[in-house]
Structure formats: structure tokens, C-alpha cells
Amino acid sequence: MESSSRRTFLKGTAASLLLFHSPWALAKKSARSPKVVWVVLRGALDGMHTVIPSFDPMLATHRPSLSKAAKGSTLKLDQGYLLHSALPNLHQWYKNKQLTTVVAVGTGYGSRSHFDGQDYLEWGGENKESGWLARALEMQHSSAIAVAQSTPLSLQGTEKVTSWYPSRLKDSSEDTYRSILSLYDTDPALQTAFKQGIELKMTTTMEGMGKQRGQFVSLAQSCGRLLKGSEGADCGMLELGGWDTHNNQEPRLKRQFAQLDKGLVALKEELGEEWDDTLVIIATEFGRTVRQNGTQGTDHGTASVLLFAGGRLPQGGKVLGEWPGLKENQLYQGRDLKPTSNTFDWISQHLAYHWDTNVNTLNRAVRGA
């Protein structure tokens, strides 16, 4: 996605390698065709306000008001963690072993620029010629669709990708479409591309679409519709901006979480039984500062949280990752939550299990090595 598009999206609020053995090998797998949904939360999600370390006594010291609101959640996870109260559906998935959370993760990006951090998250590192997801899909010979206004960096570098987004234009008549098609008689490639666009439009204008253009719930529902069935894409990508909470964090995140929670439910419902063969990966570019600021918010940080959802998780219903602690000498650069594991390693592990492929080979593809 180009920087200008990304900046526009950010302003809106509405739309080393770890190996696991027995838990991964013993988890039940499906024989059906697997689907993948990659969800990027743009703006730097506060992981500590998402999966809340209520057991850490330093939380209230660093966040006197934010921690009070967050620790009021009754959505309990294991090891003393809490899930934010605005994520009730995800909590039910957790209890059903359809959600995994990973705390204190980082991509390896070393600064705090949204745009560079998002590029790093999508490339799979620095200065890549293709996106990490595009490389992984090429290895699997899979196709993808991005529910975005243009092809995001994650999916650049593969020919088996298209993008779709609700049109600003009013619906046109069939005669209009036929007239446009006739203009492409001498260019079969353009004619085919136009036909595919019309087919996508028809697929996504069925009953149940929300009235508000770009609304995440509607986009997630459309994503599920575009993935469904033998003719659907193998992978979809969604984006949701609005996570840059420098002020009034609690009410803003409450609204954001509600939108995310409802959107993912819409995705699951649209996929139906195919949810059992779906892996949803939810990540952000970096986290927030450990200390709250003077405007009831947080600033750009380092480690955040990573979420996996779906019907075929190897370790569903778990909080994974190592908690680094919140004492002064445990903070990264004296201000941030310290990353204790790498985002791309976790993604590679989950994708390797989901696709039943070699984790080391996949990790090299994801990292562009």
C-alpha cells in the first residue's frame, strides 16, 4: 500500500526459530482445503491493553488509570492474563480453543515510525522485493485477494493476487457493463480483468452487506464470501486502522475492539464450515509505551501482541510467549515492553502446521532468506 493510502487509513477508526513437538503433532487436523486470513491492525495496537497482565504488580504503577479500566475485565485467560472486555466473542473462541494469543512479540524492527514499521511487518524484514505473504503463497502455489484499495505490500510479488474494495460509484446496468466490455474486444487481457472485477462485484453485493462503505464488519464478511468454496481464493487480507492511541486510549480502544470482534465473527459466520480449515493471523507494526502519558494514552513502543484464530489451531486456548516483566530494569530502552520472541517465527510455525509443510523452509520464505 502506498504511503498516502496508508496515512489515510491510519486516520480512520472505522475501516530466532521456536520448534514445538507433541502439542503440534497431536492436534487434530482437517483434510479439507485450508484458508488463511491476514489481518493488519495499522497504528500500533497496545498489546498490554489487549491481553492484560493483571498479575504484574508494576502495571498499576506505570498505568494508574489505564490499568484500572483494563483490569476490570471479567474475560479470564490462563496464567493470570485477562482479555479486554470489548472482545467477548474472541474470548468465547479462546474457551473453544479457537484463539491463541502471543504476548511480548516484535517483528525485529528497531525504530518507532508507523510507516517504516508497517513496511517491515509486510515485507518480512528490511528492503525486500516482495511481501512475506506473497513469498509464502508462491511456495504453496496459492491465490490471494486483498480487501483493500490497492495491493498491500504483504502480497506484492506474486501474480496470483487481486484486490477488491467497495466502489464509490453507483451500481451500473448490465448494458453499461456490456458496452465497456465491447471496448476491450482488441485486448483480451483487459477484457478478462474487467470480467473478473464484475464477478467480484456481483459476489460481494449479496444480501447482508452493510450500508456504510469500508466498514470493517462488512469488509470481513465480504472477505469470507470471496474465500468460500472451491472457486474461492486460498488467502484473504484485511486492514483496520485507528490503533494509534496517544490520547483517550480506553474509550477509543473499546470502540476499536468492538469493531474487530464483530468483524471477525462476521468472517467466521460467512465461512461457515470452512472456518474449521481457516487460520486467521492478526498483527500490528509495534506496541505502545509501558507508561501511560499525560493525555490518558500511550506513545509508540516496541513489543505488542499477536493473535491467531480459526478452527485448526495447534495450541488453541493458550497464552503463548514469555512475559518479560515491567520492572524498570526489565523495560526495553527504559520505556517499552521488551520483545521476547519474533512475530515471523510464530507466523511461520502456525502456517507450517496449517499447510502441513516444513517450518524451516517456510520460515526462510517468510523472512526472504
Set out the residue ranges of the language-model regions.
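Feature for exported/extracytoplasmic and membrane-associated proteins, marking the mature portion
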Residues: 2-270, 291, 308-369
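Active-site lining segments that contact anionic ligands and/or coordinate catalytic metals
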Residues: 233-235, 283, 301-304
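Metal-dependent active-site segment of extracytoplasmic phospho-/sulfohydrolases and closely related
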Residues: 264, 271-294, 300
